[in-house]
Amino acid sequence: MITGYSTPSAHVLMSSRAFKSSSYRAAAGQTQHYLARSSLPVVKNSWGSPPSPFNELPRVSRGVPLSYLSASSSLLLNGEQGSLSGTLPVLPVRRKTLLTPRASKDVPSSFRFPPMTKKPQWWWRTLACLPYLMPLHETWMYAETAYHLHPFLEDFEFLTYPFLGAIGRLPSWFLMAYFFVAYLGIVRRKEWPHFFRFHVVMGMLLEIALQVIGTVSKWMPLGVYWGKFGMHFWTAVAFAYLFTVLESIRCALAGMYADIPFVCDAAYIQIPYD
């Protein structure tokens, strides 16, 4: 009886264990199947673009302002999603300035002679003629080398020889010292009259231009410098420079500005603007 009773109970126990294991396996299989199905969109979203309310926003091209966004997207910008309108970068608008840049305040916009309200005193007019003695001296020396002008200038040597001899006896550094003192001490200082400073820098520019022409001509072959071309060239240069210097001296004595093309503009730009 005991063995007969124990046998069905053992069978029932084993069958119940088998039922529990089979039901557990079925439940585990259903759970795994459910988890696999539920995790599938997550895996897809991890490989693709994540579902976000920002994907619903319309794409705004570069340069389009934020006011063109739709009404539905404005809720995301100012609603409960975190106020994203403040996080979007807004580039500042550049305003074009109409002011023209200037290199220096001393450079005038146009080259015009100041109005002569009254005639300068006679001593200022006399001093304004002195800077032209240097280019006149150089012009006379180059004119004497010209074949056509030498016979004519020989009659006036007694007038020019004392001055030319005095200039020739000066030391070699005199011209350099003269230019530095005249430019820094007179031209660039506003204490002197504008009329006097203008004629000082005019004489300096005429002297420098003539020295440059003489230096460049010495680099030419001797056949050109002493030939027929050089003879006509120095005759033309001597006539042009002689009349230019004499016209400048006449304007200085008359109390006027010498209106020499190109040279007067170059002289006026060297003077600080008042």
UniProtKB/Swiss-Prot annotation:
Alphabetized InterPro entries for the sequence? Tic20
Instruction: Mark out the transit peptide.
Output: 1-65
**Residues passing through the membrane, by range:** 130-152, 167-187, 200-220, 229-249
GO CC, sorted alphabetically, is: chloroplast inner membrane
Spell out the subcellular localization from the entry: Plastid, Chloroplast inner membrane
Q: Which GO terms describe its biological process?
A: protein import into chloroplast stroma
Membrane topology label: Multi-pass membrane protein
Q: Which residues form a coiled coil?
A: none
Is the keyword Transmembrane helix assigned to this protein? yes
| Expressing tissues | Expressed in leaves, shoots and roots. High expression in mature photosynthetic tissues. Lower levels in non-photosynthetic tissues and roots.
| Entry keywords, A to Z | Chloroplast, Membrane, Plastid, Plastid inner membrane, Protein transport, Transit peptide, Transmembrane, Transmembrane helix, Transport
Task: Say which domain of life the source belongs to.
Answer: Eukaryota
The entry describes its oligomerization and partners as: Part of the Tic complex. Component of the 1-MD complex, composed of TIC20-I, TIC214, TIC100 and TIC56. Interacts with the translocating preproteins. Hydrolysis of ATP is essential for the formation of this complex. The 1-MD complex interacts with TIC21.
- Sum up the protein's function in the record's words: Involved in protein precursor import into chloroplasts. May be part of an intermediate translocation complex acting as a protein-conducting channel at the inner envelope. Seems to be specific for photosynthesis-related pre-proteins. Partially redundant with TIC20-IV, but not with TIC20-II or TIC20-V.
User: PANTHER family, from UniProt?
Assistant: HIT-TYPE ZINC FINGER FAMILY PROTEIN-RELATED, PROTEIN TIC 20-II, CHLOROPLASTIC
Family per record: Belongs to the Tic20 family.
> What protein name applies here?
Protein TIC 20-I, chloroplastic
What organism does this protein naturally occur in?
A: Arabidopsis thaliana (Mouse-ear cress)
What gene codes for this chain? TIC20-I
